[in-house]
Amino acid sequence: MSKTNKKISSDINHTTKYGSKTPKKVYLSNKVIKRNKNDIRNISYKEINDEFSWGNYLNLKVIIMNDNGYINVTKLIQQANKEKKMGDWNKNKDSKNIVKSACEYTGLTEDKLFIIKTGGNNSTIRGTYAHPIIVAQIAGWASSDFAIKASVIINDYIAKQMFKEHEKIIEEKDKTIKRRDKKIDQLNNKMDDLLKKNDKMSKRIKRLVDTADDLRNQNDDINDKLDVVCNDRVVQSDTNTHRFVIMKNNSDKEDYEYHSIRRLKNSVNNAVKEYKELYPDAEIIMNLGYTPNSICLWNNIKKKLKSKRKIKGTGSDFNLRGDFTEEKLIEEVTKIHNSRFER
């Protein structure tokens, strides 16, 4: 091998622009050559001698140099189109542009893209050998059939590359979606936990409210018992200091609809005012301007009306039952109130 050929072979094997570089050594053993899968020399199928081999270049029988993969384009053109010659390609303006681009791409000078072999006594190997990167351009110029075959392969390669790119994009999107789905699941789980905690808290609050209501009612009952020991009948007096009022809530709240107020004369107005702060639409449906003992009166009312299943409630709050109307309530309370006076 000449020094020039060795230098070109070294440049090809170390370039990173053309095909894939072949840093591994090429071993010849029983004519089986192991190389990088992208090495153009893989098209070789039979050795001519130590320097050259026959190769199959898209069904074109070509001669390829063993050390650098250069292909005899003179013989390739003769085989593809007997009317064309290598000299014709060299004169072509497009060809010169291709050579220029190949030099820029490979980093080789123009004189290193081509090797001329005289062949000596062996005319088989005689001709111009071209760098593999421009062989397809020359073959396509010489043969329209080859150009179409090469176009199909190029399009197939581009399509496969783009398909791989699309798969990568889809894969990345799928990963992003999975990450987001996982995040959404985590947020949903947190939301579920918060809803459960809120539900538990709501139940606790309701229990506390119920307990507070019970305590308030118990307190009212205790106050009733502590404030007075009442009899069924009392003596009417001109100095009545107690007042008894029944309020109607007129509210959509899930509370009792009616409320009784038992207060001293000088505090009943404040009690009504405070109640209206809780229930702005509340109204007085009954106001006994005089009663000897409003606490005792209310105990008697509850006792008699509950026993007749006319009202239900706890403490000072109550609802009417069945067909027991507001008018009947006022009538019954008036009767109970009047029945307490001695005649």
Swiss-Prot record:
A Pfam family it matches:
KilA-N
Point out the coiled-coil segments of this chain. Answer: 159-279
Q: Does the keyword Coiled coil apply?
A: yes
Which controlled-vocabulary keywords does the entry list?
Coiled coil
Stretches assigned to the KilA-N domain: 51-157
Name this protein carries in UniProt? Putative KilA-N domain-containing protein R904
